[in-house]
Amino acid sequence: MHASAQMKKAALEATRQELDALCARGVRMEGNAFSPIVLIKGELNDEERAGGALLGGADGTALRASCAAIGYAPEDFCALASVAGQGDDPALEAGKTLPTEVFREALEALDPEAVLLLDTAAADLMRETYADALVAIDDFATAMLKPGLVAHVLGRRVLALDGFEAALGDKREKQRMWAYIKQLGPAGAPY
């Protein structure tokens, strides 16, 4: 095996082990860990709280379609919960917000170029976790992750929404969410 291929294989294995360890501790993730976009959800629905797939319902279907429409490949879909699931880390209580250091560890392990915060709970945790980087943003509303504004945080584009799943039942709200999401197309996309 070529040295470069061996290095890639070793890096892939190290990433897999890091993500497996986070999941074993109680961090909930679904999808492609190498996706350029990560969708973060904090307000889980009944199915998700009962252990169902994260973004496995109508919200996930709509988000997959939205991501595809703005240029992401179908496999470019990764979801991260800002609340803990079942795990072996006694510091993580299922259903409770992840500690900031664990959330940061998970997001840095995924290392996306874009982050979509789907609800207020996700935005609150992002704001608390990355306060050190957000304070450097000149515009106060952007630094506070006001819904609809794209913030550049440690080389990532971050966009907060204020309740994507709840907006699905209201045509105007759904259109507003779509207008926001269109700002977060893939880096280098020609549109």
For each predicted feature, which ranges?
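A polyanion-binding, active-site-adjacent surface
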Residues: M1-Y191
